């Protein structure tokens, strides 16, 4: 056990951690040269294309150090994006040390901070690695100072590397072996293992990634999940090198995978403790919590025949990702679809993109919303995330909405605009400080989640030319003035356009969407009224004027009454059309109408 090292790589998005993982695998001959691809551990196409890691991955490397000893290194590659922060915290709980990778031209960013603090909470030994030192803009000395001032860890012995060219990779491996502690654990104690991740394999069923803390996990053993007391028999045990290699057992300190004839990923909660049925351990490992979706939106197939394929696709994605939820729902305007819950906007985009690409579905998604707590006058508390479930305004006592604490790091030349963006989004400033003696400001803000889920991140990036970084966590619920904004086209409510907004925004948002619909809905032979309403009160209206056919064109001279008769007939016809005519709102009108204007 003294020769095992378990470590995670933590970094902000794009600071090069997946590339560093590639180099470490190469250096330890984990894969043959012909099998090496860029970002080996990012197995999904979207992960490679967007250059982000979504699922936590693991690999075991065998390394012979300069002192001649053979070491077994378990590397956990963690996601860097804020939506997947729970995956990061679980991966960190399974390790004793971390490599903190910082881009030596960009320096420390908000998510680096958040993840480092998680590592420190897990009592990790941290090795600082400065990447991209081959770039002309690299300034390692400045970044070392910044790390010491912002994070408060010693960066004098930072390792300078370039993951792209392979410079300094050997030094990283030596540092892992010499500076990081070996895992603690007792192989004779009852089995105690933490469930780090799980995914669905078409041949093996559910595969669980585990880190054994105490005891030994053997093939054929009956195990118990401590969160729900479900029992299973272990069928296979193995490790990733990154290829699967069956080993038959895992003992204290080791990281590997097991399969146990589980049908669904939802059965194995990430962060749960696994123990033996015959000889269970006395208590579960700390840090387990259920992950709940934060952002909701409805997804409808553009072709109604695709409904069953959409259900199958969602079930397949759910096999791999239990943090995302879905329930069937119907809409008068869009037909049958699903109400889905996600961890954040990136999570939503990734799932939607996977549905469209991997399953070839053509989809419409409604405006994302968050969970509001509504207390009715008879004392009931409802959790509402779908505008159509919102009770009548006369029956509502109070509405509470979720607030978050956001940490934003931004160069000071963009500070003014970022502050006004936060104020515009109903933010409350908590703290503003400067990072050491640099020109980077560290902002702490409390913001309503509903103002952040839409396009806050994109606006933040565009205002700051990409230099600002954001990390957030949900803090609490606060009472708020919330209204349901409904839209009527020709007096008929269109449920797919309804949204829940803050009272101060209702009129502006209503006018915007009505104006947009006016441009998007095709003209008809009769007049169309588009209205926005809150409660029973109309707050905005636009009118689409009708086409007018010139029915008098063929008249030449003659009596004026003939002309009047034809015009009268046209008027009657339009009236009849107006009462029976059904307006087909094109699909793209929904999507375009719900986009928020800057």
Curated annotation (Swiss-Prot):
Keyword line: Cell membrane, GTP-binding, Hydrolase, Membrane, Nucleotide-binding, Protein biosynthesis
Localisation: Cell membrane
Keyword Hydrolase assigned: yes
Any one Gene Ontology molecular-function term assigned to this protein's record: GTPase activity
EC annotation from Swiss-Prot or TrEMBL: 3.6.5.n1
Summary of the function given for this chain in its UniProt record: Required for accurate and efficient protein synthesis under certain stress conditions. May act as a fidelity factor of the translation reaction, by catalyzing a one-codon backward translocation of tRNAs on improperly translocated ribosomes. Back-translocation proceeds from a post-translocation (POST) complex to a pre-translocation (PRE) complex, thus giving elongation factor G a second chance to translocate the tRNAs correctly. Binds to ribosomes in a GTP-dependent manner.
Name used for this protein in its record: Elongation factor 4
Organism: Wolbachia pipientis subsp. Culex pipiens (strain wPip)
Gene: lepA
